[in-house]
Swiss-Prot record:
SUPFAM superfamilies cross-referenced by the UniProt entry: P-loop containing nucleoside triphosphate hydrolases
Sites where the protein binds Mg(2+): 229, 250
Principal subcellular localisation of the protein: cytoplasm
Organism classification: Bacteria, Pseudomonadati, Pseudomonadota, Gammaproteobacteria, Legionellales
Gene behind this protein: mnmE
Protein known as: tRNA modification GTPase MnmE
Organism from which the protein derives: Legionella pneumophila (strain Lens)
């Protein structure tokens, strides 16, 4: 790891009452003395100082805080300067810090140093960015839980159980004279099944966290004049799409973002799906299919007065889209019939015009994507889900090796790989490429 000293503005761009400049590294204290006219600083105490340019001209006045390593966020000596929130003043403080020996920090470099100095693990580092970017109260609370180590503790406990199982299996293989018959005594099978069960439980909780963090891409599809634009307007609570009786009014992709019980919902309204000779409409339909293939969930809107629309288009969607994308059929315009709003697992009857049945639709969406708020929930990322899925696949393979082939060495290797995969979640075993990708997504100053 580099041992140079870094500096960055830690507050958002723009003007404000207070702006913070953060410095971290072996020369942080010396740079602070250059800025404050050699006024001594006590660790963990705020000191009021005048702040100077190199020619002893006063730049500003503010508070300077000194955190002596390793008792700091990064584990290094850290200085935080609380000056007035003028972009000009803060830029001058950065320039003076660089002149005194610091360099400008890369995005996320403060958090990266905290990770490399074992102040936080990789889950906690990601949680810092997630807390900053949280789109709802619940997402912020869940990010804080991850930052406080809730998710990490679950992974570490799982790893401890896996380490114990690995030791038992490998000891039996390496020391056959001890006559440990792990292939037949049932202990390994029970321990392995328990670990798989715990992993599935954590995976389910992590999936809820991914929904809260990343949200859900919900694509509205249907024939022209089925009421798609009216539905997106009602879901959004405002007029975001033009609604007319003319078929083919919507020709391009329309996007709107709302919160559905704290889940960020990225709603995409598409052109009506039909054969058309109009070049502009054909391009809109082409883009609609592209969005459908990327969706997390599809709402197929059907005019209840023309139910035959549903069969052909539903079959076309089923044949074209990946099996993992759920399709909810929405029978619209019940206000023109004697029907009332109702729903079942993948079907909703509603009126986009009056709003009747919208609550039922929201309920079905949450059920279809598997959102179930639970105690102990935490924020997670897709890479965490991928690692958990990979670890489970390895454990299931190992279980098969044990049950069907009595292959102890192959079981031991699958357990080792599963352990390594889980350690990638917390960063115990992580490639430099992954670290670079994660920390580069942070804002500068974190």
């Amino acid at each position: 790891m580099s041992i140079d000293t870094i500096v960055a503005i830690a507050t958002p761009p723009g003007r404000g009452g207070v702006g913070i400049v953060r410095i971290s590294g072996p020369n942080a204290y010396a740079i602070a003395l250059c800025l404050n006219g050699n006024k001594a600083l006590q660790p963990r105490l705020a000191t009021f100082c005048s702040l100077y340019k190199g020619n002893n001209e006063v730049l500003d006045q503010g508070l300077v805080l000194y955190f002596k390593g390793p008792h700091s966020f990064t584990g290094e000596d850290v200085i935080e300067i609380q000056a007035h929130g003028s972009p000009v003043v803060l830029d001058l403080l950065i320039k003076e810090s660089i002149a005194a020996g610091a360099r400008l920090a890369r995005p996320g470099e403060f958090s990266e140093r905290a990770f490399l100095n074992d102040k936080i693990d990789l889950i906690q580092a990601e949680a810092i960015a997630d807390l900053i970017q949280a789109s709802s109260d619940t997402a912020a609370r869940m990010a804080l839980k991850s930052l406080q180590g809730d998710f990490s503790k679950k992974i570490n406990q799982l790893n401890e159980e896996l380490i114990y199982l690995r030791m038992y299996v490998e000891a039996a293989i390496d020391f056959p004279e001890e006559e440990i018959d792990f292939l037949n005594d049932g202990n390994v099978s029970q321990l392995l099944q328990r670990i798989i069960g715990r992993l599935e439980e954590i995976r389910s909780q992590a999936n809820q966290g991914v929904l809260l963090r990343e949200g859900l891409s919900l694509v509205i599809a249907g024939r022209p004049n089925a009421g798609k634009s009216t539905l997106i307007n009602n879901l959004a609570g405002r007029d975001v799409a033009i609604v007319t009786e003319i078929a083919g009014t919507t020709r391009d992709i329309m996007r709107e973002h709302i919160l559905l019980d704290d889940i960020p919902l990225h709603i995409i309204d598409t052109a009506g799906l039909r054969d058309s000779d109009d070049l502009v409409e054909k391009e809109g339909i082409k883009r609609a299919w592209q969005e459908l293939k990327r969706a997390d969930c599809v709402l197929l809107v059907v005019d209840i007065n023309n139910p035959d629309q549903q069969n052909s288009l539903h079959n076309e969607l089923k044949l074209t889209l990946p099996d993992k994308i759920p399709i909810i059929t929405v029978y619209n315009k019940i206000d023109t019939t004697k029907l009332t709003a109702k729903c079942d697992e993948h079907t909703v009857y509603l009126s986009a015009k009056t709003g009747e049945g919208l609550d039922e639709l929201k309920k079905v969406i949450k059920q279809v994507v598997g959102y179930q708020p639970t105690e102990g929930q935490f924020l997670a990322r897709r890479r965490h889900l991928q690692a958990l899925d990979e670890a489970k696949a390895l454990l299931l393979t190992g279980q098969s090796q044990l049950t069907n082939h009595k292959a102890g060495e192959l079981l031991a290797e699958d357990l080792r790989l599963a352990h390594q995969t889980l350690c990638e979640i917390t960063g115990e075993f992580t490639s430099d490429d992954l670290l670079g990708k994660i920390f580069s997504s942070f804002c500068i100053g974190k």
